[in-house]
């Protein structure tokens, strides 16, 4: 089934750039319909401008580093150089000549300096080898010099990673090196056992003590379902070995299947029956030659030399007794010889910044303490591509690893040395022409057709005078190219320009070929880059110039049009008449054209493309605004309502409209007919105007179609904001189609190994892309396939009827192109039918028909796709002008016979035309094929109808025209319709469906179409050449598809792909897309791979199961979640601009490492300000320098938690090692989790491992004057720790005492009755199935209460639980977890809220349940939440919230604004579940989106007892410890009530609907196996609740007190809103300024900020609180540091607010990725004014007259547009005078914060004017239309 056709869409990078831009443009033109050809041309000119939707591309090459000396020549011990030399000869990743920086690393680490290392080299520089080689060297030296020590167990190196995904990636690399059997022999020399390694993470099987039962549960399935299954599959096993995904051990011997014995029961009920005795005690034993340890128990017995783990697991390992053997063995090994040193590798070290970095820094110090060694005996190697300068890197490394600056041990920063290259040379014209004429297309097909590529190379070699290559294979050709290109002038110039730098592509071409014409320079650049990327040295795999291209795209943020048809500023060169002027992408008041035409937003009708402008009018409707009025007004509101105004030249004669005349320069609207010379133009408004509501057309006044398909549906008169995922899909498809294949195309690899890795910020976005991209592609692919199927049928003289005939031809197309389509069961059915067709007929379609072969019934998705292709408005054959549906030949003949017999006076061609129109009418009603189920019809149509079918009549407008036709009449029409119904339909009771066998599809791209000038409809035929078959008008023109700009713009996007397969014989391309996020990482411990890992393998074309197919596109979140290094990857796509440049560079760096072609990095920007900023300034993100990481080890809050951890760990380990307790059934949980919480607080009398013993132990060992632990702990605490003036020893004692007090306090909340703990369901890093008491294990209890290190991870997590009921091995049914993604509760309250759609693994669920983390078998899982609900007391009108835990006050009036206080029930979710516990039907995509509030600081009932410090004239501050914040999702406020309806038994939940509250029996949101005693449905009562979460953290609290002359009356809505905006602004600026302070230098995400307005205590004063808090629950100590540096921070805050030129806020000052939801509230000038008052007592004053005039400038422009005259007087009494006719008004402005009664503006003293008015500047900015209306009222 291999298709020999090459993909035609291949060529150079300039063509790729052009195609990406063109395809995005075509998509926008096709989806956002415009009718007028002049307007089409104008939009195209705008789209083709640089920076509208595409940014200039940048080219960048990964730098290549200088090779160093061979190992034998390095000044390192001979033992190390010998081993490294031997290993380098094995071809396992170490090369015989390391890079120079790798040599330097070896010399520094192993040589006389014995320095610790920071490997600070870039991507692709061999960082991994840079730390593995020193480890190998140390192992070799130990073997040679200390053989006795070498035989001892103990970790020689710990490799620490931030995430499991990176552990998996590193494990794969280590397997390839240390796991190689030959390498192991070399490393083993001088040792009694192989050097072993092991990964110890949450996924390592299995936690807890080993037992036969648990081996059966957790180990047996790993082997039975994976390892043993693949043992005989040599190719797959070899591939897994190659990529490091197969364990380096003797799996057969380790599993020991032969130890199991068949036995027979000799007594009891089962006497005589056989069973298997597994003898697990004799199995799972490490084999003598094993290099890898794969279970926890292996590593606990004898720890590996290399331990790979993550820092959170290392924390658990230090704490838990079960792992103590690992550290004891290492400790003994270290003691055995003073030359022994532990190596600690911190890969991706730049990630350890901020709170997480401080946590890891203290963990490292505790590790040293646990091993009882000084820091100097721990050798550290840090790696990072982004650590800033040498000094910064050194300081960071010392702080992180605890190395004192005065230590004899030093850090050496290893930086890459760029390789020295031959000098670049001036390119000759001969070289430029030879490169430009190089056959790049053939060369790009090298993976599929080596001979053609070789011929292209041979021709180039001849022209260049190079010796011809001898063709052998790809490797030989690549090596030959490498040799010949090295030293070649153009390539050396290229390397010099782009190595390690980003250069614009056009500048690159000019610099490379300055004397060549542009076209030649571009082609030569394409060839040079392609050759340089393909060239690869065989000896070490070095690519000559690994290159990537950075491309930035975005959609349109909207279109805004000048209303002057004669505008002289138009971008397009369209010479004919048009209906509007220049188009813009931003809102403007006026165009710059000669007439200064007004600019309004452009809307068009989706069906016909008719153009409208969106304006806003008052009830007088005499002036059109371009923007709505704001929400606030000092006077009576004059509401403006939206209006759609038609700007087409002629509406349809039968439509309803009113004529109006719009003044081009001002926007005045007149009912009176105006002369053309008067500056007016004619427009049309809706006929019926309803007061107070949107003024829009019910039917389009051009095409007469309804503008809404249903009452609640959005209008089809739509804006031009590019929406959805489809534009991004278009870019990804283009990106992959232009990518050269990396392997031959065959049945298993239909896309030739092409891959794209997609990154999104957000797991749900990544999941949605994985679901939606295949669906976006599917319909286009189906259209192409059906077009080819029709062509095939035509070739064998078969009619393409939409029956099984078409389905068989469709299968033939799939077979010929090795194509997969659809997914799930539908895909399986198609594959089975396709394979049967291939097997029986070798894909010969004619033969299959001759044999009357009939495939099985087509699957559901085929039927849905066929309905869409025939019936949908926009994507059907006729809708895309690809073809149409007509009667079959036989039916045409029979209908003509009937027409003649009825003596109807009509020509046969008109019967055919009417038949096609009649068929089309029925198709638009989806009345096709009665046998198709109504559920499929609903999915295809996208809407519900209770009954489907048609009356079998012409469309209403056409029927009316036909009846009025002189030669026809009503009877005539009815006879014609009856003939059509008889021959073309099946039906009964007056409901008809088109019969598939009576129809045929006509695919004809050359067909000449007809278009109606009145209604714009496109149709294949017209009646009598001139009558429109849609509306019946007699104004039809002929449209030639190849010449029509309208068809090209509107339909070209869909026509072109069909043309490519029919005319150009292109290969069909489908993409397999899967999600790859942490939410898929839940793994049943019985399976080897989580879903993500399986997808990674398929993305690497490793197909484990027979039915596996390669994944082409992997949709991920962050790079840290991609645990695979796909070196050959050449395409990355970013769905949005990442938050920081390091993120971008890391993601982009995934492409172009070792690929064979130029890599592309495509970024699609959102319309948000953060994305726009980097879209317009790509050089800042592509090549900007990363931030220097800092780790703040002086943070006492974090140190306190590590002290707690050390105390608990030491207490338990000491007592357990002393063996003072008797082993009991609880020993396992004691070893694994420090026992149960209840035992520690209320029991454990037998073991002494309880709070009383701990209390005594702390007092004896620490608090007493001779406590021995005081000094040892003080030794590992950072010297810079902020201890409040205490010595380290005294601070430690103080912390220990406070810890005891905290534990005694917590003892009161721990229940004393113990629950049974099922150890099988427990794990450390994974969520348990749920327990009666939430933190049953002591370790989890201490973590939950924030007493142990959290590593900046949220401790309050929520999960979304997807379950299924399955039959277990015992044959009974049980509930199993399918997926259980987790998020912090603050995120989950928005993303998992009831009503939200959740996409997991391409399945869509609607959140519909909120319950507790209960056991799976529990029936009523929500009861616990309702047993302990909280109260939420808040005001609807303002931000006031009262402490829910302190609600004695019964006052129900808001003390801030006077509104009514509401008391709501608030529950805190633990688990969310899907509606009805199942995924949604495909057609159900409705969701209700609600959001969680920012953290709010509830008001106490009693006065707070804070000791404030003075911070300025009107501001005080304090550092408030352990304050409670609350964050709430209030649902939607509709109908006066908000919140969610939640069942108090099962937790079934939905957004509260006051009109139809949830009630009655309902499905549970989780799986439950019903018994006879329990009904299937839950009948619990629904309650209306808020979903919320409160948490404690530390605050920096600032209190501003405002008084006269500033406004203080917060009961006034304007005053309240103004203060809230000012506080939003200062809070955001404060957060940014604090995070940038030199003592903090944090990611702003580690700080949160907020505000609250306090109740007024004194008259005419108002207190305003701002707070800055640690986002880490329990606090990270940053608020304390901020308080200590508040003067600097407040100065920086004010500078940030005043140091920008924008009006309110922008990306240069306040706007960024994370605050997009509040940017409308940010006003830097207002915030600065309030902060300046608070700090310095400066009262806002009226500005000078000229600045007032500047503030009034927008109002002035608006008034002048409306015909008023504005005179700039420039005096205090009259900054501006506005006049009309003989009346005038003096106008000024004043700061909004000034209180009106205490303030009189000078305009009120003005003379010689009829009136005066002063505007509040805050209101002026937010409600300009209102100010305009106020002036109008004064002058008219």
Swiss-Prot record:
Biological role: Component of antiviral defense system Druantia type I, composed of DruA, DruB, DruC, DruD and DruE. Expression of Druantia in E.coli (strain MG1655) confers resistance to phage lambda, SECphi18, SECphi27 and T4. This protein is probably a helicase.
Name of the protein in question: Druantia protein DruE
Motif DEAH box in this chain: 347-350
One of the GO BP terms on file: defense response to virus
Record: residues binding ATP: 121-128
Alphabetical UniProt keywords: Antiviral defense, ATP-binding, Cytoplasm, Helicase, Hydrolase, Nucleotide-binding
Any one Gene Ontology molecular-function term assigned to this protein's record: 3'-5' DNA helicase activity
Gene: druE
Domain Helicase ATP-binding stretches: 108-405
A Pfam family reported for this protein in Swiss-Prot or TrEMBL: Helicase_C
Main location group: cytoplasm
Localization (cell): Cytoplasm
A single cellular component GO annotation: cytoplasm
KO phenotype (gene knockout): When this gene is missing the Druantia system does not confer resistance to SECphi27 in E.coli.
Start and end residues of each Helicase C-terminal domain: 1014-1199
């Amino acid at each position: 089934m291999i298709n020999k056709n090459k993909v035609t869409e291949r060529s150079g990078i300039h063509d790729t750039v052009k195609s990406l831009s063109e395809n995005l443009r075509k998509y926008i033109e096709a989806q956002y319909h415009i009718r007028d050809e002049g307007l089409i041309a104008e939009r195209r000119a705008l789209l083709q401008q640089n920076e509208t939707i595409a940014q200039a591309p940048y080219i960048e090459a990964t730098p290549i580093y200088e090779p160093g000396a061979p190992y034998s020549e390095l000044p390192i011990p001979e033992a190390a150089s010998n081993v490294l030399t031997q290993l380098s000869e094995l071809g396992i990743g170490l090369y015989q000549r390391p890079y120079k920086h790798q040599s330097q690393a070896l010399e520094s680490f192993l040589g006389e300096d014995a320095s610790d290392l920071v490997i600070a080299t870039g991507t692709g520089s061999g960082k991994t080898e840079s730390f593995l080689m020193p480890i190998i060297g140390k192992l070799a030296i130990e073997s040679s010099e200390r053989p006795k020590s070498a035989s001892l167990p103990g970790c020689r190196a710990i490799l620490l990673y931030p995430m499991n995904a990176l552990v998996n990636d590193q494990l794969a690399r280590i397997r390839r090196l240390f796991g190689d059997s030959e390498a192991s022999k070399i490393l083993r020399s001088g040792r009694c056992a192989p050097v072993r390694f092991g990964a110890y993470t949450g996924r390592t099987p299995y936690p807890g003590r080993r037992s036969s039962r648990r081996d059966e549960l957790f180990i047996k399935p790993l082997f039975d379902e994976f390892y043993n299954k693949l043992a005989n599959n040599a190719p797959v096993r070899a591939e897994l070995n190659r990529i490091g995904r197969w364990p380096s051990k003797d799996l057969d011997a380790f599993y020991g299947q032969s130890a199991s014995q068949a036995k027979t029961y000799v007594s009891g009920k089962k006497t005589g029956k056989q069973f298997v005795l597994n003898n697990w005690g004799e199995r799972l034993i490490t084999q003598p030659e094993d290099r890898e340890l794969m279970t926890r128990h292996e590593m606990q017995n004898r720890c590996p030399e290399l331990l790979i783990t993550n820092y959170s697991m290392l924390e658990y390992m230090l704490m838990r007794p079960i792992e103590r053997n690992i550290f004891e063995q290492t400790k003994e090994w270290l003691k055995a010889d003073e030359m022994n040193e532990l190596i600690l590798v911190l890969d991706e070290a730049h990630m350890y910044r901020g709170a997480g970095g401080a946590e890891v820094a203290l963990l490292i110090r505790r590790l040293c303490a646990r091993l009882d060694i000084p820091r100097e005996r721990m050798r550290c190697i840090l790696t990072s591509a982004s650590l800033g300068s040498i000094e910064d890197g050194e300081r960071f490394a010392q702080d992180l690893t605890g190395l004192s600056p005065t230590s004899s041990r030093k850090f050496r920063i290893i930086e890459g040395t760029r390789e020295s290259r031959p000098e670049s040379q001036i390119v000759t014209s001969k070289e430029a022409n030879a490169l430009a004429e190089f056959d790049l297309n053939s060369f790009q097909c090298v993976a599929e057709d080596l001979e053609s590529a070789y011929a292209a190379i041979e021709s180039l070699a001849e022209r260049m005078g190079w010796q011809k290559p001898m063709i052998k294979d790809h490797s030989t050709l690549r090596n030959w190219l490498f040799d010949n290109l090295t030293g070649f002038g153009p390539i050396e110039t290229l390397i010099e320009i782009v190595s390690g730098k980003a250069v614009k592509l056009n500048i690159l071409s000019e610099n490379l070929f300055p004397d060549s014409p542009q076209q030649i320079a571009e082609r030569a650049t394409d060839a040079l880059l392609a050759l340089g990327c393909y060239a690869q040295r065989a000896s070490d795999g070095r690519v000559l110039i690994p290159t990537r291209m950075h491309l930035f795209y975005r959609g349109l943020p909207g279109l805004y049009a000048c209303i002057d048809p004669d505008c002289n500023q138009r971008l397009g060169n369209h010479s004919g008449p048009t209906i509007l002027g220049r188009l813009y992408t931003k809102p403007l008041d006026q165009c710059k054209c000669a007439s200064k035409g007004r600019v309004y937003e452009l809307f068009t009708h989706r069906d016909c493309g008719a153009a409208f402008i969106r304006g806003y009018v008052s009830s007088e409707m005499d002036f059109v605004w371009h923007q709505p009025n704001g929400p606030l007004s000092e006077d009576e509101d004059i509401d403006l309502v939206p209006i759609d105004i038609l700007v087409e030249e002629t509406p349809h004669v039968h439509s309803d409209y009113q004529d109006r005349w719009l003044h081009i320069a001002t926007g005045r609207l007149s009912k009176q007919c105006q002369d053309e010379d008067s500056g007016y133009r004619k427009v049309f408004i809706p006929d019926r105007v309803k007061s107070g509501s949107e003024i829009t057309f019910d039917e389009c006044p051009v095409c007469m179609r309804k503008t809404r398909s249903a009452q609640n549906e959005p209008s089809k008169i739509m804006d031009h904001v590019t929406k959805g995922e489809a534009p991004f899909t278009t870019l990804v498809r283009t990106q992959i189609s232009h990518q050269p294949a990396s392997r031959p195309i065959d049945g298993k690899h239909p896309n030739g190994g092409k891959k794209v890795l997609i990154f999104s910020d957000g797991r749900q976005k990544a999941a949605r892309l994985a679901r939606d991209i295949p669906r976006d592609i599917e319909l286009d692919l189906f259209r192409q396939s059906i077009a080819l199927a029709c062509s095939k049928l035509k070739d064998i003289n078969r009619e393409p009827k939409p029956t099984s005939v078409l389905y068989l031809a469709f299968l033939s197309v799939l077979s010929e192109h090795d194509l997969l389509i659809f997914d799930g069961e539908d895909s399986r059915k198609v594959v089975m039918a396709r394979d049967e067709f291939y097997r029986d007929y070798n894909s010969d379609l004619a033969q299959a028909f001759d044999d009357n072969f009939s495939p099985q019934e087509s699957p559901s998705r085929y039927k849905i796709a066929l309905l869409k292709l025939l019936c949908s408005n926009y994507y059907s054959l006729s809708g895309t002008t690809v073809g149409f549906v007509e009667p079959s030949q036989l039916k045409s003949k029979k209908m003509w016979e009937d027409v003649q017999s009825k003596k109807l006076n009509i020509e046969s061609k008109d019967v055919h035309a009417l038949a096609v129109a009649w068929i089309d009418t029925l198709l638009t009603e989806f009345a096709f094929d009665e046998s198709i189920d109504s559920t499929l019809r609903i999915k295809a149509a996208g809407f519900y109808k209770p009954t489907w079918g048609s009356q079998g009549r012409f469309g209403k407008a056409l029927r009316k025209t036909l009846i009025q036709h002189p030669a026809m009449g009503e009877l005539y029409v009815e006879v014609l319709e009856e003939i059509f119904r008889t021959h073309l339909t099946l039906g009964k009771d007056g409901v008809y469906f088109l019969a598939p066998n009576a129809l045929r599809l006509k695919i004809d791209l050359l067909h000449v179409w007809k278009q109606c000038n009145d209604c714009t409809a496109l149709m294949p035929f017209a009646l009598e050449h001139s009558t429109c078959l849609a509306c019946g008008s007699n104004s039809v023109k002929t449209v030639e598809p190849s010449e029509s700009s309208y068809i090209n713009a509107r339909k070209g996007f869909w026509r072109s792909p069909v043309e490519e397969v029919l005319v150009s014989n292109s290969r069909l391309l489908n993409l397999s897309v899967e999600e790859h996020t942490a939410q898929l990482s839940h793994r049943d411990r019985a399976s080897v791979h989580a879903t993500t890992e399986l997808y990674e393998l398929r993305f690497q074309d490793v197909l484990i199961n027979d039915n596996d197919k390669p994944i082409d596109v992997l949709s991920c979140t962050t790079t840290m979640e991609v645990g695979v290094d796909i070196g050959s990857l050449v395409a990355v796509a970013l769905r949005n601009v990442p938050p920081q440049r390091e993120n971008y560079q890391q993601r982009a760096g995934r492409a172009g490492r070792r690929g064979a072609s130029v890599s592309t990095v495509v970024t699609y920007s959102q319309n948000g300000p953060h994305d726009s900023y980097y879209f317009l300034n790509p050089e800042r993100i592509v090549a900007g320098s990363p931030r220097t990481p800092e780790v703040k080890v002086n943070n006492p809050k974090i140190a306190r938690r590590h002290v707690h951890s050390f105390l608990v760990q030491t207490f338990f380990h000491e007592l357990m090692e002393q063996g003072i307790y008797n082993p009991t059934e609880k020993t396992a949980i004691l070893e694994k989790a420090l026992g149960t919480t209840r035992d520690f607080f209320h029991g454990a009398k037998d073991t002494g491992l309880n709070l009383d013993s701990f209390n005594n132990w702390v007092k004896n060992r620490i608090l007493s004057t001779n406590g021995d632990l005081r000094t040892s702990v003080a030794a590992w605490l950072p010297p810079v720790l902020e201890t409040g003036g205490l010595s380290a020893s005294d601070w430690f004692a103080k912390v220990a005492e406070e810890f005891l007090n905290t534990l005694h306090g917590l003892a009161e909340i721990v229940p004393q009755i113990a629950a049974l703990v099922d150890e099988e369901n427990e794990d450390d890093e994974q969520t348990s199935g749920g327990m009666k008491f939430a933190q049953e294990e002591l370790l989890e209890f201490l973590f939950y209460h924030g007493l142990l290190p959290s590593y900046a991870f949220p401790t309050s997590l929520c999960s979304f639980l997807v379950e299924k009921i399955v039959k277990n091995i015992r044959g009974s049914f049980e509930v199993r977890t399918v997926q259980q993604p987790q998020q912090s509760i603050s995120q989950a309250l928005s993303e998992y809220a009831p009503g939200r759609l959740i996409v997991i693994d391409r399945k869509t669920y609607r959140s519909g349940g909120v319950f507790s983390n209960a056991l799976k078998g529990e029936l009523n899982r929500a009861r616990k939440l309702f047993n302990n609900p909280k109260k939420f007391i808040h005001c609807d009108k303002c931000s006031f919230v009262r402490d829910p835990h302190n609600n004695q006050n019964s006052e129900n009036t808001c003390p801030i604004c006077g509104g009514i206080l509401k008391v709501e029930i608030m529950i805190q979710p633990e688990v969310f579940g899907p509606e009805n516990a199942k995924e949604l039907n495909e057609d159900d995509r409705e969701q209700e989106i609600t959001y969680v509030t920012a953290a709010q600081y509830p008001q106490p009932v009693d006065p707070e007892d804070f000791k404030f410090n003075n911070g300025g004239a009107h501001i005080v501050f304090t550092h408030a410890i352990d304050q409670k914040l609350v964050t709430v999702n209030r649902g939607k406020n509709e109908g006066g009530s908000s919140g969610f309806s939640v069942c108090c038994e099962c937790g079934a939940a939905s957004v509260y609907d006051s009109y139809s509250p949830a009630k009655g029996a309902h499905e549970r949101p989780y799986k439950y196996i019903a018994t006879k005693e329990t009904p299937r449905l839950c009948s619990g009562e629904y309650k209306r609740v808020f979903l919320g979460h409160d948490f404690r953290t530390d605050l920096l609290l600032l209190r501003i007190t405002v008084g006269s002359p500033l406004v203080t009356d917060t009961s006034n809505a304007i005053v309240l809103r103004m203060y809230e905006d000012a506080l939003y602004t200062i809070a955001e600026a404060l957060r940014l300024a604090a995070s940038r302070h030199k003592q903090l230098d944090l990611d702003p995400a580690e700080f949160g900020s907020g505000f609250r307005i306090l109740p007024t205590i004194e008259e005419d004063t108002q207190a305003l609180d701002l707070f800055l808090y640690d986002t880490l629950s329990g606090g990270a100590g940053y608020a304390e540091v901020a308080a200590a540096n508040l003067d600097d921070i407040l100065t920086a805050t004010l500078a940030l607010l005043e140091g920008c030129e924008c009006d309110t806020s922008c990306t240069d000052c306040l706007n960024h990725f994370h605050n997009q939801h509040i940017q409308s509230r940010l006003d830097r000038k207002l915030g600065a004014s309030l902060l300046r008052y608070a700090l310095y007592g400066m009262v806002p004053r009226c500005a000078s007259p000229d600045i007032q005039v500047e503030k009034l400038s927008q109002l002035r422009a608006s008034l002048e547009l409306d015909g008023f005259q504005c005179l700039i007087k420039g005096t205090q009494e009259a900054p501006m005078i506005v006049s009309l006719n003989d009346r005038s008004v003096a106008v000024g402005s004043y700061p909004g914060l000034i209180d009106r009664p205490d303030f009189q503006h000078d305009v009120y003293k003005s003379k010689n004017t009829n009136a005066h008015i002063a505007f509040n500047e805050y209101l002026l900015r937010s409600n300009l239309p209102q100010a305009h209306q106020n002036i109008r009222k004064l002058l008219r």
